[in-house]
Amino acid sequence: VPVQNSEIAQIFNEVADLLEIEGANQFRIRAYRNAARTIEGYPNRLYEMIESGEPLDEISGIGEDLAQKIEEIVETGNLVFLEELRSRIPPSLIKLLNIS
């Protein structure tokens, strides 16, 4: 089953949440949030664009780095960067923040 835009957006939102917990640069956090919003509302399926070789970084708000991450998600079903963030933040803290 191909990865849907909504799933990619969800991953980018989680990355933004975890970066926020870590106190990362606000511009970086905003880039992930804006990309998630753009992807969520984007009319074309990103996996189809990748399959046909269309460049993702031509989408407003999606730079080369985020385009590579989208390709990784579509091709592998997950994002190594997200796994790294999850491993650095205690699950209990994530759970606590999800409740509030």
Q: Whereabouts are the PLM-identified features?
A:
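Structure-specific DNA junction-binding interface
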Residues: 1-97
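Short, positively charged, Gly/Tyr-enriched micro-motifs
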Residues: 100
